[in-house]
Amino acid sequence: MHHVNKYFNQTMVIEALKMSFYKLNLKQLIKNPIMFVVEVGMILTLILICFPDIFGTSYLSRGYLITIFIILLITILFANFSEAFAEGRGKAQADSLRQAQSNLTARLIEENGAYRIVNATELKAGQNIRVENGETIPADGVVINGLATVDESAITGESAPVIKESGGDFDGVIGGTLVTSDWLEIRVESEAGTSFLDKMIALVEGAERNKTPNEIALFTLLTTLTIIFLVVIVTLYPIASYLHLILPIAMLIALTVCLIPTTIGGLLSAIGIAGMDRVTQFNVLAKSGRAVEVCGDVDVMILDKTGTITYGNRIASEFLPVNQQMLEKLIVAAYMSSIYDDTPEGKSIVRLAKQMYINELPKDIDGTYKPFTAETRMSGIITNEISVFKGAPNSMINLVKQQQGNIPLNIESLCMDVSSKGGTPLIVIENNVMLGVIYLKDVIKDGLVERFTELRKMGIETVMCTGDNALTAATIAKEAGVDRFVAECKPEDKIKVIKDEQAKGHIVAMTGDGTNDAPALAQANIGLAMNSGTISAKEAANLIDLDSNPTKLIEVVKIGKQLLMTRGALTTFSLANDVAKYFAILPALMMSTIPEMTSLNIMHLSSPKSAIISALIFNALIIVALIPIAMKGVKVKGYSIDRIFINNMLIYGLGGLIVPFLGIKLIDMIVQFFV
């Protein structure tokens, strides 16, 4: 579990209790019309306690009125506590994050190379700073010199230090993290108030935690039901007078509270907040509650092969020359094309070449390095005497053809052989002559087959996008268990895939980390960006994974579904409760005047007074009983949507009808001795 778990402590509970009383303010409760009605009823009951005959002759003792008042107060406090406790978890994490950036100083590098100590808040973008072992990095930036290990646990919760160095994919650093070895020179990329940590704090504190469309729709439904029940209660009073049935105002207030959907009304905000918090516990930042909720509607998941389905550290395992006489030349050419390649693949090619080549390989190569891009899909070096490139088969074949070169007859079979094993083939050319193929071995992550099977049962289709050729993609897709794949996929192709799926009415989720992924992340309904990715990718996405683990998208989608299921399950339970309470209480109230109603008093409640008190107590206790479910969410198993629906109707629908009858009867058996 991550570091947020430590916030389940006594201090949090005490703070939530304090906030429960603060939220009694009518200005606070007006945001929740259901609980607002309960508080208005509580205030009217308090008026009746002070002035018993203000609404006519009172037929209830002051002690009975005080009992109703206390139960109504406790009901509101329980509802407020559930929301305050959920909010408190986020605030506690925000306080911890804020501590990571407090009272920081920086060692600013002057133009003459001298150092000057300044406050971290004075740093400007573009300035250079030096951070040494044991010091906290004062601002977001990029490493321009040095190599060191950095402890990012204050931000990500991951205890293992990570290596940061200039160049490559690991040169970005976050303000508030700790250098645990050596030193770094960093170019500042953000100023005070705009850092990644500042944005995290704003997100965690819920600055943008507005109600989601589904939540608003449900609130509208519940408010409408509340108004309907209010109308029923108001019309009940003249009907009771006509039937010569005495129904004191306090009992009508209590009856109203029992019948309106107070259970889900008291828990709805907590469910939404807790859903965002569960995502945070997985070290994923949600920019809004809407993002988490949309995750629950996702039915198509676009996944990159490298890093998501496979481990991503493809390793060169073999050199396959077009003929054995070319082996030595192939090794040297592969080495030269990779010597300035900082990717894991490039480094593995250099290692393999050194292991296999018995003669001395060239060390200092004076030339122009051409890095890999998504468009060219090749990398290499051009010198005065020679040009050497390695890259994807199609790209290399097209390049050789454009320059009127020859294509060896067996080059295609060599590539197919590698692809059929699930590997990635890279063709190596020297001066437009094909020398052979590099076999990059890729390994599928453990447990993915089972997880994809579970997603399929939940109605989610998985689509693998990869730059590999169709044969390699098909082999990996079959082994991993994904539903479909898109081979030789470029960044713009991802956008087309997403738009095509959305045009069919699907809700699409995807992951990305590069600037070239930003348009697709913005187009997708759910975009999960990696913390190690570019700023543009993180701005385009609506979720950010602090662990930079693309596989996390699967967990986030499950949390979104859990949020929707929890809200639906507790709404079903609450409405079923109201129906049960209606048939439990009304006969007990009417049977003294209408003897025919006695047959409907199936629970044999002892008296109208005890029936009302018992129902009110049950109404308050059920909110407390359901807080753990609202916070943790209902269990999500790999069942089909139909199976989940049936299970929820049996557990929360039927259970919502049965539990009130049993609960109210048990409470009535105790209350009858005091009323």
Swiss-Prot record:
InterPro entries: ATPase_P-typ_cyto_dom_N, ATPase_P-typ_P_site, ATPase_P-typ_TM_dom_sf, ATPase_P-typ_transduc_dom_A_sf, HAD-like_sf, HAD_sf, P-type_ATPase_bsu_IA, P_typ_ATPase. GO terms for cellular component: plasma membrane. ATP binds at D341, E345, F372, T373, A374, E375, T376, R377, M378, S379, K390. Mg(2+) binds at D513, D517. GO terms for molecular function: ATP binding; ATP hydrolysis activity; magnesium ion binding; P-type potassium transmembrane transporter activity. Its main location: membrane. Keywords: ATP-binding, Cell membrane, Ion transport, Magnesium, Membrane, Metal-binding, Nucleotide-binding, Phosphoprotein, Potassium, Potassium transport, Translocase, Transmembrane, Transmembrane helix, Transport. It is a multi-pass membrane protein. Pfam families: E1-E2_ATPase, Hydrolase. It catalyses: K(+)(out) + ATP + H2O = K(+)(in) + ADP + phosphate + H(+). The chain crosses the membrane at residues 34-54, 65-85, 216-236, 245-265, 569-591, 611-631, 644-664. Its EC number is 7.2.2.6. SUPFAM superfamilies: Calcium ATPase, transduction domain A, Calcium ATPase, transmembrane domain M, HAD-like. It is found in: Cell membrane. It comes from the Bacteria. The active site is at D304 (4-aspartylphosphate intermediate). HAMAP family: KdpB. PANTHER family: POTASSIUM-TRANSPORTING ATPASE ATP-BINDING SUBUNIT. Belongs to the cation transport ATPase (P-type) (TC 3.A.3) family. Type IA subfamily. Part of the high-affinity ATP-driven potassium transport (or Kdp) system, which catalyzes the hydrolysis of ATP coupled with the electrogenic transport of potassium into the cytoplasm. This subunit is responsible for energy coupling to the transport system and for the release of the potassium ions to the cytoplasm. This is Potassium-transporting ATPase ATP-binding subunit. It comes from Staphylococcus aureus (strain Newman).
